Each structure stands twice: as C-alpha cells, then as structure tokens.
Amino acid sequence: MPTSDKSRQTSAGKSFFGRKLHKERPVEDRWDAHGSWESLAPPSSAAGSRSSRYSKRSSIQSVDFGADIDPSLLSTSAGPITSIPFESLSTDTQSPIPVDYLSKAETSPRKEPSPGHLAKGVGDFHQYPAWDPSAMRNHQQFSHPTGPRPPPHAAGVAMSSSATGDKGARYQQWGRPGSSAGNAGLSHHSSSTVDSSTNSRMSIDQASIHSSLSSNTRGSSYISTDGSSRTTLPSHSNDRSNYYAAMNSGRGSSAQGAIPPAQPRVQNTEQYLTRPRDDRVVDQLFLELMQKRGWQNLPEQARRQMMAYPASKKWTLVHQDRLTELQGEQKRKQKARETHGYDGPSGILERADEEGSPEWYVKKVMDDTITSKQLASLSVSLRTQPISWVKAFVEAQGQIALTNVLVKINRKKVTGPVPAPPSGDKDLDREYDIVKCLKALMNNKYGADDALAHQQIIVALISSLLSPRLNTRKLVSEVLTFLCHWAEGQGHERVLQAMDHVKNHQGETGRFDAWMRIVEVTIDGRGKMGSLVGASEEYRSGGIGMENLLMEYAVSTMILINMLVDAPENDLQLRCHIRAQFISCGIKRLLSKMEGFQYEVIDKQIEHFRENEAIDYEDLLQRESSSTKDSIEGEVKDMTDPLQITDAIASRLNGTRAHDYFLSALQHLLLIRENSGEDGLRMYQLVDAMLSYVAMDRRLPDLDLRQGLTFTVQSLLDRLHTDAEARRAYDESLEARQIAEAALAERDEMKAQVELGADGLVRKLQKQIEEQTGIIELQSRQNEMLKAELADVQRLRAQELQRNELETRELYLMLRDAQDIAASNAKKSNMGEAETDPAHMRGILDREKLLTRLEKQLERTKTQFKLEGKVWGQHDPSDRLRELREQMDGDAGPREAFEEQARLNLSLNPVGSVYRKKTYIQGMEDTATEELGQTDDEVVYAKARLVDLHRPRMDPEQATGLLGEIAAKVPKIDADDAKDEGKPTESEQPAEGAATKGDEQGVDDTVAVDKATAAPPPPPPPPPAHPGLSGAAPPPPPPPPPPPPGAGAAPPPPPPPPPPPPGGLGGPPPPPPPPPPGGFGGPPPPPPPPGGFGGPPPPPPPPPGGAFGVPPPPPPPGTVIGGWRANYLASQGAPSHAIPVMSSIRPKKKLKALHWDKVDTPQVTVWATHGTTPQEKEEKYVELAKRGVLDEVERLFMAKETRIFGGGVAAKQRKDKKQIISNDLSKNFQIALSKFSQFPAEEVVRRIIHCDAEILDNMVVMEFLQRDEMCTVPENVSKLMAPYSKDWTGPDAANTEREQDPSELTREDQIYLYTAFELNHYWKARMRALALTRSFEPDYEHISAKLREVVRVSESLRDSVSLMNVLGLILDIGNFMNDANKQAQGFKLSSLARLGMVKDDKNETTFADLVERIVRNQYPEWEDFTEQISGVIGLQKLNVDQLRTDAKKYIDNIKNVQASLDAGNLSDPKKFHPQDRVSQITQRSMKDARRKAEQMQLYLEEMVKTYDDIMVFYGEDNTDDGARRDFFAKLAAFLQEWKKSKEKNIALEEARRRTEASLARKRINVGLANGAGAAGDAPVSPATSGAMDSLLEKLRAAAPQAKDQRDRRRRARLKERHQVRVASGQKIPDLEGAEAPGSGGQNSGATDTNATDSSLLSPTIQEPEGGSSPIASQSEDVADRAASMLQDMLRNSPDPERTRRRRESAEEERRKRRLRRRNGATSGSKDSNDTTPLSPVTEPTSTQGESAEPENLSLSSPPNGEDPTLNPPTIVLSSDASDTPDDEHRPSTS
C-alpha cells in the first residue's frame, strides 16, 4: 500500500487531522482571536512557512537499505500512535498550553494502538514503542516541538516495506521544501503527515501566518519554539545542516522574508557523489550517517550487523543520502523560483549551473558538450515538464541553439568529406535527437511562434529533410506539415522560402528536386513484394520493422505534399504552380510506386491529391474560359494534352500583339530539336525553369523575374550537363575496369595452363572432349526422342482429322436420311408444295442450312487433310471413311441408283430407313469406339479389329481342361453368395456367415493351398493378342467379357494376407503341427497377417474395412501408462524445497563431487528423522573434524587441479585487449584459423584479402568465412566496431584515419574487423564466388555422376525383358492363387515386398522362394535380370529429389556469381579493398563454370525425364514424394530378397540331396538284411522295424514327440515297408513271394520319385524340435549300427506267429487309414490331407496322374535332369515328403 494511502487510513480518516476540519467555514472565518496561532506561536515561528492547504510536500526521497534495521531514534518498529509524556521533556521547557476551542470528539490526546499499527516494521526486535525519557532528554534541543504530534521515531524517517519483496527497508524522507528538515534531507513523517496539505496548488499568500497552520498543526498540543519551524530535531544532526530562525513574521512580511535560509552549496557535484578510494573514509561517512539518522539507538545486534556491512553497501547508503540532499536543495530552489519568482542579479547564471534546468540544457547545447543521453532527457523534459519550463527554455534561446547544432550537422553532411562510419552514425543519432526535441518544442505555441520568428529554424529542418536516416526524415516531414498549417498561411510561406533557400544553397534546379529524389530512392529501396529481394542496403539493415517505418514515411511525405499544395486556399494559380513543380519532379511516377504498398492510408492521400488536382484544373479552366474576349471559347478539356493547351492559348491571344511573341516562342522551341541527345533535354529543362519564373513573378518571395534572369544561359547549361557527364564517365570507367579485370583473369588462366605443362593440359583437354562427347550423345538421344514424338503428334493429328471427317459425314448422311423421310411422309399425306420444301419444314434445326454448312466443312476438312498430308506424308484413310467418301463422292450412276433405291424404300416402307439408320449408327459407334479406345496406332489405318480384341481365343480342349481345373480349385459359391458380390469381401464378412460354410470352406482352402505349394501349377495360357489383356485370368463359365484395356480404376492390390479362419481366432485349434513362435494359434493353412500375435489370448478379429491393415499393437505388459507410482506422485503436491544451510566447516581444497539422486519428498521417508537444525549440523561437523574424519575424506578424495594453459604473458595480454565479437565467434576463429595461429593478425588478413591459395584450398577456413555470423554483422557489434573501422566505399578511403587504434582489440576481433566488417557490403558475394572457384569441378563430377547413374539404371529397368517376364510370372501365379474378385492386371512395386510374407502351411517356404525356384529350374534364361538391374542396389538410398535440388543449386550458384560479377556486388571494383584480388581469381574459373552449368542442366533434364518415365512405366505415381523416394529402394529390396531366396533354396536342395544319399545307403543295408532274413525264412516284423525306427528318431530328437508327429512317422514306416516288401497290386498274404522285393522296388520307385520330385516346389526346412528329417550331417555310424541291430533282430525272430500278427496289424492299419480318409472328407480336419488309402482298387496309380497332367511334370522334373524311372527306390523322411503320401501329389478330382 502506498504511503499516502496508509496515512489517509490511519489519521486523516479517523482523527482531527483530516481534511474535513472546518471545511464548511471560510478561510478567514476559521480562526478567531483567541484561537489564532499568532497568539500562540513565537514571533519567529513563521519563518519560511507555507500554506498547508496549497502546498505540496513533494520532497519525498526513498532510501533502500539492504538489511532489516530500525533507523528511528526510538526503538520502535511500526509506530502505534502514542503521545510522548510531558515528563520526558527537559526541565527548562514550558508547560503545554491547552487548546479549548476544538471539539472534544476530535481532541483525543492519545489513541490506543489499533491492530493496524502493530508490527509494521520490518525489524523483529520489538512490537510496541519503548520510551526512554533520558534519551529523549539528551536528544531534545528545543523546548516544544511544533507541527503534528511527533511520531514514535522522531528522527524524521519513516520505514515502509517494499511491495516488491526486497530485503531492505525503504526509508522515506519527508520534508517541506524550504524547511530545515527538507534542506538537510532530514524530516519527520508520521502517519498523520499526508493530509490536506498534499494539494499541489500554491498559496498566493506565502507569508501568511494563517496559511502556515496546516491540519497537522491545528490539533497539536505543543507550542513551537524559536528554533524550530516544524518539529523537534535531534541535536546530533546539526553537523550537516544549519537552522536559522525566521527574520520576519506576520502577514505583511515582504517577499524577501520568504527566501529560504542559505544552505552550504556543494561546489562539485560529481566529486561529492564519487566514492572515495579509501574504505576507511567510507566507514567514517557511514558512522556519520548512522548518527545523522539516529541509528545509534538501535539494538546492539542491529548495530553490529550494520557495522559489518561491506564497504560497497555502506557507500550505497551514503551515496543515496547525499543524492537526497542534492535533490532536495535543487527542488527547494525550483519551488522558490516558482513561488516568489526572485531572480537576483545572478539568477540566470546560477540556474545555468543547476543540472536539469532549462538554462543548463541551453548552456550544454551551446557548448556542444551535450551527450546523447542528455539530449534524450531534454526531449523527455520538453514533453513532460510544465509549460513554464518549456517557455523558459525557449526564452533562453534553446530552440535556436538546437537549430545551430542541426545546421552544423547538415553543413558537414553536404559540403564536408564523407565521415567515417562511427562519427557519421553519431552525427545522425544526434540529428535525430535534436529533431525530436524540436518536435516537442513546436508542440506548443511558444515553440511554434519562435520557429516562425526565426527563419534559420525552418531552414535547418528543411535541410534535415534530406537526412540519410529514415526516422529523421519522417519526423521532419511531420514537423513541416504542422508548420505549414500554423499561423494561417504564414507558416506555409515560411516553409516555401526555406525550401528555396536550401535549393539555392545546394545548387538544385527545382524547389522539390532533391527532396523528391531521395523519396523516390527510398521507396525504390523496398524489396519486391515487401521482401529483401532487390532491397536497398538501408532497407536490409533496418531490421524487422523497416517495412512499417517505410510505409509511415510514405504517409508523412504524402501528407506534407498535400499540405504544401493545398495550403494557399484562396490562390488557385499558386496551387497549380506548386502542383506543376511537383509534377515536373516526377510526382506521378512516385504516386504509382506508392500505390504498390497497398496501404489504405497512403491510398487515401493519393486519392486526395488527385481529386484536388482535378478540381483545381477544372476551376482554372473555367476561370480562363470565362475571361476570354469576344466570346471566343478557349476551353481546355484536358490539361495533360499539349494540343488543347496550345489551342486554348492561341485562341485567347488571337488578334493581340502577345500572339506574335507566343508564336515566336513556339518557333524557338521547334528549333531546339536540331540539337542532339542530352542537349535538347537540358534546353527544355532550362526553358521550363525560366517560364516558371516568368509565370510566378512576384507571387513568391524568391520568384522575382529580375532576380531570376541575372544568370547566363551557359552557366545554367554547364550545370545541367554536369550530371550527364558524370554518369557517362562513371559508366565508361566501370566498363574499362571490367575489361581490365577480364584481361588479368585471362592472363592468369594462360599462366596456369603453361604451368600445367603438356601432359596436364592434354589430360584436361581429353577430359573436356569426353564430357563434350557425352553431351553430344545425350543431345542426339534427345533429338531422336523429339523426332519420334513429333511423328506421333503428326500421326495423331492426321488420325484426328480423319475422325472429324468421319463424324461429319455420318452426321451429314443422317440428316439427309431424315430429310428424305420427311419428304416421303409429306408426299404420302399430300401436303402442299410449300410444305415439301426442306426450307419450310419445321424442326429444331434449319436442316438446309445445316446441310450446307456440313458440306462446306467436309470440303474444308478434305483440303486441310490434303495440305497437311503433303507435308507429313499421306496416311491412308480407314475403310469406313473410304466407304463414306465413295458413297458421297462416287460416280453419278451408282449414286443415282443408290438414291433411287433409297427413295423407293422410303416410299414403300418407312421403317426400312430406320434399319438403315441403325446400321449407320452401329457402324459409327464401333469405329469410334475402336479409334478412341486405341492407345497404339496399328489399328487406325487397317480394318476394324475390335472383334479380335473382345475375348482371347484358345483351344477348346485346353479351355475345358483349365475350366475344370479352376472349378475344382476355386471354392464353391452358393446362390446366396452370388447375390453378395457388391458386399464386402470374404475377409470383411461377419464370422457367423463364414461359420455356416466352415467345413466346406476349410477343405477347399486347404486343397487350394496345397495345390499352390505342392502340386505344379498349370502353365499360363498363351497371351492374347492385346497387351492390355495379358494379365487377365481365363474366365470361368459363363465367361464374362474381360475389362477393356485401361478402363476402370487402379488395378486391384496384390494378394493381401488371408483373413482369419471362420469363427474367430479364439476357437479351439485342430491338431496341426505346433506353429513356430510368433504365429497364430489357429489352423495353419492361412498364413498370419503381418504384425500378428502368438499365443492366447489372440487379438479380436479386425473390424470391417481394416482386415487387411496392420492392427496397431497394444502396449506390451509392464508399460502401462500411468501406474500407481505416477498416480501417487501426481497426487502429491509440489515438494517444498528447504534451502540447505551451508556449514562453516568447508574443505580447504576442492574435492570430488558425489553425485546422487535427491529425494523429492523426504518428509515421508527415512530421511525425515535426519533433518537436523543448522546448529546440530554444525556440531556434527565439529565432531567429525575432531575425530579426523573430514581430514581423511579431504586427503582421499581431493580433486585434481586443472592446469590453465596459456596463463602466461600471452593470456595476460589477451585479457588486456578488448573483445567485441561474441565468445562463440572468437572460439570459432581460433579453431578455423588454427593453422595460421603463428602468423600475426595482419598477415592472416593479407592472405585472406589477397585470396592466397592456402586460404582458398583450406576447406575449413572457407566454410568458416562463409558462415552467417561472418556475413551478417549484429547491430551492437556494428556500433562498437565503428570507431575502429574504415569505409572503403568512400573517396580517398586509403588515406582516411581510423578514430581508434585497432590494436586495442584482440587478434580475432582485428581479423573480423579487417575482413568481414569492413568488407561487409560485398563479403557474402565475395566468399561465394571464391568458394565456387574451388568447388565447381568436384561438385560437377559428383552430381553429374549420380545423374548419369540414375539415367543408366532407369534405362536398364526399361530394357530388361527378363525382369518383365519375372514380374509377369509373379502376376500369373498370384492370380492363380487369388479368388475371382482379386484378379489383377498388374501390381505396383510395393507388392514385391509382400512376396516373402506369404508362406506355406508349415511357415517354411515363402512365395518368393517358390518364384525363384521356378525361374531357376524352369526359366533359367530369365535369371540374368539380377545382373541387368543390379544398379538399383547402389541407388536404393539415393533421394532423387534431393539430387535434383543439388543440381539446381549448383546451376543457380554459378548463375548468381556470374550476375554478381556482371551487375551485382562484385561488378564495381572501386568498392573493393585496394588489395582484394577476388575479381581476378573468380574471372579465371567462370568460363569453365558456365560450361559445366550448361552441361549439368542437360544432364538434369535428361535424368528428370527418364526417371519420371520409368516410374510411369512401372505404374508408380511420379507426383508422389514417397513413391519417388522409394522407387529404387523397392526394386533393390526385391533383388536382395531374390538373392536370399536363391541361397536358401540351393542350401535346402543340397541338404536334401545329402539326406537322400544317406537314406539310400541305409536302404541298401536294410535290403541286405531283408534278403538274409528271407533266405533264413525269417521275414521282417513290421513292429520290430517300427520300434527300431522309433528308437533312432528318439535318439536324434532327444525330446518327446507330439502325437501327430508319431502318427506321421508311423505312416512313414508303413509306407517304407510297403515300398520295400510289397509290390504294387499284390496282396498282403503274398509277402513271402520270391518276386515281392524286386517288383515292389521298381513300381514304388516311380511313385516315390514322383512324390519326391513333386515336392521340389516346397523344400523342407529342418526342424530341431523333433520333427526334423535325418540328414547326412549327423553321424552316419548311428545308421550303420541301426542296420546291424536290425539284422540281429531279424535273425532272432523267425516265429510264424509274429509274422501273422504283423500281417494282421498291417491290415488293421490300412483299414483305419481308409476310415480316417472317409471321415476327413466331411470333417475337414488336417489329417484328411495326410491319410491316403493304399488300396490299389480305389486309388489311381501314379501313371494315370502323369498322363492326366503332362504339363505339371515339366515343372517338377528333377534338378539334374535325371529320368525318374531310373532312380532306385528311396525313402524320404523329410517333413513334407514323410508327412504327405504319394497319392496326395496327384491332381484332385473332387
């Protein structure tokens, strides 16, 4: 709460100190005789008194202290309102005089402390006042205090806490100006001080005794003594202030008596406020301050704390106290002047020494010692001080003094040499500050009148209208606009006079020429569309707000122009003259440029200018026309038309003598044209200037005709020629310099070629020839392509002409037929002759006109076709067109016969014409459809072959076979399913609908998958005639027509993963082999979609529409977002971190840090009991120190001291240097230029400016010098660097001295100063050009090689026939696998990545492996595509768009550098450093750079076209960024996957061959054992051999086997036994026949070979879990031992009973297998695929299967080309061969 608010709350509102006391009584009636203070106060009590009601106690100073102290004399902290007991006063005082006239309700002598008065102090020593009579008695100097009741702290200091939370208390010094307390800065303040006397109005009667009685003194029960004017003061405060008694009293005292007592003036303010060097002096001053403030009475602890302050803090308090004294004295003098207006003989001189007074500012301005900060303070004072202050400044000639400084700046700017940047910027800053001050001055009447009274003020402002600083020009425009409006036209005249004065002084021709010129240059400096493109240097350096500033400047300029033109309201001719002067300066061009800002305020001003112009010209013409003599009309319609103006003048002067002079003047004007070029322009300019003088003679002060003609024409022409000559000389010098630079560059180039020698030059020329050869080949290819495109366009044009003629002829014949029908109908109905005329027939169209127009169009088309045919070659018309031509243009005989026949048909049967009409329409539609639907052009010039393209033809027998096979493989579709074709696909159908067909669908799906993976697929049908239909599958009956080529939407996507099995994923799975980890738990035939989950619980089935997408995986267990800990921590509040108190015992040296994680909330942890107080911690540390623990810790864990390198003399010198640039930039300088660290800064700068090779070849240095912080100079760095720099763009820059020595700067700052700062105007372009000389060749090699590689790879993709065949094979097999609604004509390259995702039923072989195996075994001629497109692997990570951007950047960089050399920053070497060789170095390389840029452009265009074409060729979207980026990557991934599949397949085949060899060896051993058993009448027992096989399998697997694996192995054992012992077609009881082994081996060998070979398309992967097949890599002695054990067992078991049981068990097993097979056909279980009946009666033999499908055997031939019938019988125990009987490989007929 502010202090005034507190005072009002505590006293004014509650006690008799309030304002409302006696408010209703007049001032004179408020005091009666007995209550008058004249009778109460001593005679001297009125000295220096002031009105309390109209005074302003504003001498409030705040002193901020940094400690919680109580500075009062009493030991009170807050000040409960108490009264001092009378016993505390000294004994020589008078007793109080009672006052009885006050009302008792308001005279409470003592108020009880309210709660608001307690605890207000910041200190915590006590709360209630402690009264010490003895102390008061010692400190009391006078008997009675006057004024209000003294506060508890009588030293005059009020303590108030800061609202901002600072630590120290704020002590407010309240003192009335003029009182001793105010003078000394020591007064009192209590809660009752701020009252009615705070009114700011001053009392007129300052010496009145009545007025000295404020509301503070009315209720006081104390009487003032002679020595006090307000209140008691401590006796110890008289060392710094003297108190004087008033010399006069009474109401009639003179003004002199009101002069305040003189105070000891401080002679040197700066010295008085400067801190002493000796801290002991500061301590002494602080002791004095403590005595002065009464702080000695503070408690002992507070005094000790204050005495322990550091010297800096003590000086802060002393400095604040002294500052308060000075400000109080200054305000006292100011108030005295405002009150009494005394100005002794030395008043003005005294005020000139007062800092902040108007006279002081004027003195500083006149001495030219005023600083920018003081100018800014003056500007603020002129805006905020009272009017009297501003008036005093004007009367002290302040405005003229400011103007003189402004004139000096402008004179230096115009006539003097170009100043260095620091001084120039300083002058511009001062100019801006002065203009701000002048604007503030003229914002009132005194300043504006003074400006009109002194012409030099306006002249100075007009001169600043041409200032380089945009802010200054804007302010001056505003001030001049105001002056034009001031004093009813006088200001406008003064401004025009000042403009003419400046024009003559600067040697300009026109009044507004210089001004309009700089306005136009400023507006032209704005970049295009407000950007930095094409912007001027001023606009670029202006920062973010430059656009707004520029628009505001344009607004100010337009307002000033309108004010200058429109100010003379009653003088039309003067307005037109001023406007004409503006128009001659190009104001119309300027207005059109300003309109480009699109700023509403500017547009309004422009519209205002144009409207007033039109109105004035209209008034002028009306006046002139009304004044013509003899009613001769001389009216001018357009003032911009010289003919009308001349006619008007001639008509007005006709018949007068003036007409002769006018004619003579025109004739002389006509003679000017004989002069050439610039002379004529200058002549007209001179004539215009002279005519303006003549026309406005004596209309303006300086436009006197005699004065204007006192010059020679030659002198004027000489002055007019100067500009053109200078411009011409400048252009010539610039051209000559560029020629010289080019010659030097050519010389250096020749020198470099000579240095290369013969070998180097030959090598370089050979390289260039190779590049040129490549470019020529590239251009030749492009020309061939363009020729082919041109031929295509020509052919299409001819085709279009034929189509148009065809349609026109068809339409013509249709209309003629319709007309014939109408005529025949008219004849039948016996209509009149008029109605039969086709011209009178009614209809929508006028048929006769239409027929005529069509005939003309046909003739025109025929002529056009013939003419174009001569140029492009004649194309034969189509048959239909030729027929129509013959029909319309044939011989007369056939045509007449044809028409007669048609007429007979129409007359007999009108319907016949309809048939003929229909025929024509059908033919037209067919032909049009044929020609419009063709993308190729072979059919256009032959007969229509649309019938050939409707449906591909094939052999009926082959079609029947294929249809039967497809019908067998495609799932059956019910009638209900046929109705749902438009509904979602089967993956999107509900699970309930799919569950109804679960059995049948499961069987069919299984069969289809098995066929796709195991059985050889049928060969693709022969491709149809049309390439667009090659991908269509043979349609099932009834065959629908195939889709037309190119019709419809995009081709269907590649086969997605099959849908989840019916019934969802949560059902109980049938007993398939255990899936590998990561698969589904459902039936294995459909492979899992990507991202599937394994194990229960399975995810829910995908929703409709998203079945094929990848479901987002749920978060894994354990990563649930927001657990108990997160909730717990969130529920806790923010921990309150207590600041730990540092112990006084600290290690002597730095120790290693112990990094730990702090507990956030120690209140609820074990550390809550460890929280000790600071005293306890201190004791703990003391105890640890006594025990030696801390010393041991300090000894063991001492941190290693880091040595500071460079801490010697060099570092000290560096510290002495001044650093301006940032630390980061300085460090970057040291890093980049580390190689040159041993050289001085001047040498490094010389090498950089000379463009030495060691600089240009150092990439680190070049990259650093091109960085943004080197090219862009921050504003603060620019200001600090300016005094050290030199402007190389100015004249004679080499001899210009720097303001400050650059050796004061650090080494890095000096390098920055000499290079990037001084050459900043062309540094960026310079470094870009130099970097180009070193980078254009390697960049060209790098980028062009990539461009050529992209073109080469794209062409290899386009030319690779093998790749297209492989993709076609993939498409055919995919369509074979897919349903009818998923057939595709092509697929995108992204589908290739999914080939490896489609796996077989055992998740072992992928579709990619299958395709690779088919191509390698069946189509080996296609395998070379991997070498043909191998380049895609090297380009898979290449971003083609980024490559194109790099190439464009390369080309644009060379173009930009060339533009800079031609007409940019590098075009004018005059602006360069004198030793800079950038132009010579750059010119040498630009010829080769331009040539390489042109070649790069050709390579880029070729690459872009080839790449886009190859993307379109492969069906990709060349406008999609993702597709462009991943095109090569997709093919590279497919190629890498192909190679992996090839390696995998070869490894599997090799493993299978080794396995077969091992098993063949085992089978021979088993055959020997069986033969021995037969010789000994001991047949082999199936159970015994099965036990041995089971034992061997268990030994290999070493793990328990699943039931289905045991079943498969059991069936394999039975199969093996039948292959060895049982012949095909024999009965089981004939096992012991002699021919059994031989016959069985032969027949079974065929079937087994078939089975083995047919499994070629799905090789097995070895499973280590127990279902793996035995391979030869395992120890073969196990097989040998097993064979020997089998022989022993056969020898030991010759029991016939066992033979019988073995036969019965075999029969039982066969019976069970048949039963399982029958059940499997209806149940759809997995075992139905693995069980095959062995009865030769029910199953077809393998030979039947081979004869049924001869094509399939070609796909499953052995890899080595062996005859399968020659192979011996084999036993394959691999997972696919052993699990699947041989009859499963036969084609299914179900």
Swiss-Prot record:
Residues 955-1136 form the FH1 domain. Residues 724-811, 1435-1566 form a coiled coil. SMART domains: Drf_FH3, Drf_GBD, FH2. Residues 1581-1613 form the DAD domain. Residues 1015-1026, 1033-1118 have a biased composition (Pro residues). One of its GO terms (cellular component) is mating projection tip. Residues 24-35, 328-341, 975-986, 1694-1710 have a biased composition (Basic and acidic residues). InterPro entries: Actin_filament_regulator, ARM-like, ARM-type_fold, DAD_dom, FH2_Formin, FH2_Formin_sf, FH3_dom, GBD/FH3_dom. GO terms for biological process: actin filament bundle assembly; mitotic actomyosin contractile ring assembly. Keywords: Cell cycle, Cell division, Coiled coil. Residues 1-275, 328-350, 975-1119, 1465-1484, 1596-1790 are annotated as: Disordered. Residues 1141-1564 form the FH2 domain. Residues 205-236, 1644-1661, 1720-1746 have a biased composition (Polar residues). PROSITE patterns: DAD, FH2, GBD_FH3. One of its GO terms (molecular function) is small GTPase binding. The keyword Isomerase does not apply. Residues 1608-1620 have a biased composition (Basic residues). Residues 274-702 form the GBD/FH3 domain. Residues 39-62, 187-203 have a biased composition (Low complexity). The DAD domain regulates activation via by an autoinhibitory interaction with the GBD/FH3 domain. This autoinhibition is released upon competitive binding of an activated GTPase. The release of DAD allows the FH2 domain to then nucleate and elongate nonbranched actin filaments. Involved in cytokinesis. Overexpression results in growth inhibition. Belongs to the formin homology family. BNI1 subfamily. This is Cytokinesis protein sepA. The gene is sepA.
